[in-house]
């Protein structure tokens, strides 16, 4: 203890010794050599006894038709060197005080300061990007410094991320009802669930991190005889954890047209599977599915010490090689896969636990991590006979580890005095009756009996550990990791957690040591720092020891076939699935042999990588008709319908959740003598099957319909049964959508210094771990155009504002008051959006006339835009720009700041969609689509390059550039559109993200006029369809004629219309503006009404097809008619028609509009499709997804800036050399 330090406080680390190097002969029994070059040292003694008791009481919560001849009325007008240094370099903070503060928040107590936890971020190098300097003042156009919008920013600690634990709202009431005897009740639950002795007592509990293949956040509990660790792992809720495009190269798979050539697929990481699909819209037919339960290794490849874009996934039978678009993406995929593999193979009921008897602890050593934290290495012996050792690394903060170490010493000393002997775990299995106890615990944790969060968490912890019975749950969790004896031992001692083995040559005989798993040193590569040129290109290492191989399945059939005809005419087969009673006991199609039943069920799960919760119900031989009839077999499970091709050379599989099936019905077959069955899927094309016998077809229809009915919730029955078990899942799903992205950014910071370790933040249903960035960026959002172009940026800006950042919207001056009303800063740029709108409407699409007029008329317009944009972007740290603004990529290069693009229409090169400004009248294929992007890019640059290059040289101080040097295809790109409307293309790069719409909800402050409400009520009272018609700020040649056509169409369609005559508001003559059309009683001129308030209250909508308006109608599930005028509106009109949610109206007059109104208000297919799309979009959070993408791609965006700077330096150096050579030649 240092001089002047109070008892119970942590010793400060000397300024010159940040690594915590020191020495102290602290060991529980016999001091062993510190691994991996670590030096152990001592920390402060224990706190006072009363302080310990108080903290213990406060911390127990944690457990817990042909075209008409009429004219178009809408025609347009004009870790450093060791494990100890791992987190020192990353500056992570999490503390025991977070639990304490969470309890105080939950119980209404005044919050106390947990102490100063400031640490320096040692990873930032001197002279790093200016984007890192978030303290630079944001300067407005008036030159005054603007203040931060969130005052709480100033009080945050200077760490890379703060991990603060906050209670879920559901646990607030439970927290307030805690009682004094909670400690005894917790001890009782631990005793019963962990099979502890009756006299065993809980001594202390701490939050900590367990270092394995991943770094896991959890809690550790010290009892009088055991050391227990518990953590909630990722929930298996069916949602995708990571999606994107990957290329796979594997000669053993027939998924590539050319052997050995990488093929690109849409990849989805979800629960225990990694699935590859041909496209992001065909998610029922996987090309390849890798079961993570059988993965033995995930390896991110390096070449000469540098990360590559390649990674391997090794299973028990083969190795798959994947290629991503860049090394950042490869690192993200490998990290996510490691965490998911760990959670899949070590989780029981979405949690994991470790149990270490104190009598088997050989040594406890401590190492410093951060100024107020350390790591405890606990070395444990399996038994006195085997001499097998396990090393466990527990990381603590706020010096809780030092206190725990001394408590362990005390408890071990007490056990030695009592003569306690080592426990042989292989001979002492857990009682089998404790299996699957967590559901009962979840029931206890329901809201009606969630007395204390800590007790519920303790129940879950105990249930998880108690369910690790080797005799009942030995498969398939920990495969290929250990010998049978070691597996049996660890199943008792450590649950399902596989652990590394280390041998100490000085103390143990090599013949008696079992090398069960690669060590932490092998996993983290921490013994030596990364050195360029030191590593050869890595190949996957072969697994030398496998505990048990994945079962090789024999193709058994319950009815042996003698001819191919007998197989085609085979009868259906029924199976007695557990928990379902669809068939009679005397069913002649039922399999009666128990062995045959189990074998068929096992094959079913193996074919489609299903979990043990699924069971086979029935199977049928059939043809699947897609592009051509494909013969195979249908498997019906309890909740799933699968198909597998039986034709040689074909590997087609289908996995269709029956929750997505709306109906199925009988139909005639395409071929004579066959019987058809149509399966109707929500939001998807129907599937058509043909059966050789009518009996099989009818039976399949009956069974499918019965299963669908059983999956529908029954009021008052299923809801009650599920409420308790779903409580913890619901609470855990409240996790912030940006959490994983922030963890990814944190992992990238660690990886930048040479270490690769995924981090798993605990998915605790009772406490929410929030991660707050250390650095607060000033985000600049540059856009031009109409109100619809600015609105998404306001929504995104408000989301970034909640994250603690500063946001500046840079656009036309007329939007300033609107932007500021939402709490965002605003800076004006030149340009009249009405003039731009008139130009675009006059030409409609990209053509020579548009280019010529723009070059002559808008030369000064573009010049002023570039100059004012440069001035407005001063002082920002990250720039997000609509590429139509033209200036952003050059400004970001000059300011050396990260640069993102965001847009509402197709802009990046792809074969799936044409460029929004060159949309053909009919689909022309992928080559044409790609050509439109190349054509537009060149035309667009040709029109502005001379002005841009002059501006670059004179104003920005940069050299001239061209399309090749700009590398626009590498810029991180956000599409603020729904993937339901704009599915991401397979050829999109990993840095292109379709996030979902950025909705700006303004209905909360809107008070509708009484006349509008009465009009809507009258329409409902008369049983009339209510439609909205409005075209935003579109400029038309004759607004009066257009209004008359709209009114006549409404009367013909016999509907009621809410009208927004925005088309007569801009650039119209005074005579036109003064002429008004007399509106009938069925038309109400409402003006501007917030879309999020109005659209859910109407039956259909007619609009111009702007991105924002299209998103609002799709979000509300409203059938839509789009009359496009220019640009991306044609694209959206086609998309809405393609997905079946509306009609694209090429010509607007009374006849065409009235027919369209009748169609969208009466066609049940369009209505149902729009409703389904609305349900899908309502589940999206576009702003949160965009923020997560920005966090995850920030490192990549910075790397682009660095690369450009290095290229400039290299070019300048070469130019200087050439100049010197020329000078010498002149001499």
UniProtKB/Swiss-Prot annotation:
SMART domains: GRAM, PH. The keyword Lipid biosynthesis applies. Residues 114-135 have a biased composition (Acidic residues). UDP-alpha-D-glucose binds at residues 786-787, 789, 1060, 1088-1089, 1091, 1104, 1107-1109, 1128-1129. Its main location: cytoplasm. Residues 1-76, 104-189, 449-484, 523-550 are annotated as: Disordered. It is a peripheral membrane protein. It holds the Pfam family EryCIII-like_C. Gene3D superfamilies: Glycogen Phosphorylase B (3.40.50.2000), Pleckstrin-homology domain (PH domain)/Phosphotyrosine-binding domain (PTB) (2.30.29.30). Belongs to the glycosyltransferase 28 family. Sterol glycosyltransferase responsible for the glycosylation of ergosterol to form ergosterol-glucoside. This is Sterol 3-beta-glucosyltransferase. It comes from Eremothecium gossypii (strain ATCC 10895 / CBS 109.51 / FGSC 9923 / NRRL Y-1056). The lineage of its organism: Eukaryota, Fungi, Dikarya, Ascomycota, Saccharomycotina.
